[in-house]
Regions:
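Nucleotide/phosphate-binding catalytic cleft detector across ATP-hydrolyzing
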Residues: 1-150, 158-227
């Protein structure tokens, strides 16, 4: 299987098909430290204020910030795979995309999380290279190919040629920062408090980056308590 372990979302592919596309969130029962939900179900528990349940986003700025929670999340997401994809232990071979600016310690953390989650053979690939290969770029040629990959926690900018990174930069700004800006704007401009999921919906509906817009985005009604 191939896994894009993102700050905001995690995608799992098998046989050139997207099998899992879920938020990178895990809900853990505080009494026994057991994961009770991952992905969308765990995301729906955010901001509920239940003391017996902790919702954790194990990745921050593109890297793992909570090793144990990340391991539980990976296991849970693999368990969500349909039975026809999951019946022969899908985690025998795993390819995981990592930020191009990852340190040795961060790479070790990714390896440990995936291996403890069930991977037997693990291969890591830098996110810009995975993105370039995914859209059919020829990164083996002598001409440089440039990729700008905006994720939830980081933006990856890289030029590739002859099968390797020529120059790259990983910036800790991405979709999560856009969400925080939306929350701050609603607070200052409209005296309204909104949650992170609401900010995400606003961004996706009226703020998505599109090459061409035949019509302006429709207005969106937002409801929330006063500050």
């Amino acid at each position: 299987i191939a896994m894009d372990l993102g700050t905001a979302n995690t995608i799992i592919m098998q046989d050139n098909q997207v099998i899992i596309d879920e938020p990178s969130v895990v809900a853990i029962r505080t009494a026994d430290d057991t994961a009770i939900a991952v992905g969308k179900k765990a995301s729906a528990m955010i901001d509920r204020g239940e003391e017996r349940i902790r919702t954790i986003r194990p990745l921050k700025d593109g890297v793992i910030s909570d090793y144990k929670a990340c391991e539980k999340m990976i296991r849970g997401l693999i368990d969500l795979m349909p039975k026809k994809h999951n019946m022969f232990n899908p985690a025998v071979k795993m390819v995981v995309a990592i930020p191009s600016g990852s340190t040795d310690a961060e790479i070790r953390t990714v390896k440990d999380s995936c291996l403890h989650a069930g991977a037997r053979d693990l291969y890591l690939i830098y996110e810009p290279m995975a993105a370039a290969l995914g859209i059919g770029m020829d990164i083996e040629g002598p001409e440089g190919c440039m990729v700008v990959d905006i994720g939830g926690g980081t933006t990856e900018i890289a030029v590739m040629a002859l099968g390797s990174l020529v120059v790259n930069q990983s910036i800790k700004v991405g979709g999560d920062a856009f969400n925080r800006d939306i929350i701050q704007h609603m607070d200052k401009a409209h005296n309204m408090r909104i949650s992170a999921p609401t900010a995400e919906r606003i961004k996706m509906k009226v703020g998505s980056a599109l090459p061409e817009l035949a019509e302006a985005p429709e207005d969106m009604m937002v409801v929330g308590p006063n500050r």
